[in-house]
């Protein structure tokens, strides 16, 4: 099973979403959180933070302790169905400037309702719902 890790990033009541380019992703153009594959020797949180920097240029973040949410899904690769596990963490930042990687074509800092509408996949909306519930009660 493929494994990736990502970050639900909050800044002053808004959440960051990235729009994938059609080049880097089979489902090109979809809106999601910063995330990516684990490199050998990395922890889940190290992966999530590295991917955040690579995909957004945002380095100054504070991880919110105690939140870890996982989604599992399958996607087609050739004739195969590939299983994928994605682990998400919450972080906060005061930075709002985003420098996109080649994997993305757009970004938005959105209020929670707008983020729910913009996210492409239901499982990402559930992660956001869980993250908001945890964050506002922390």
Regions found by a protein language model. Give the residues of each.
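NUDIX/MutT-family hydrolases
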Residues: 97-128
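The catalytic Nudix box helix
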Residues: 33-67
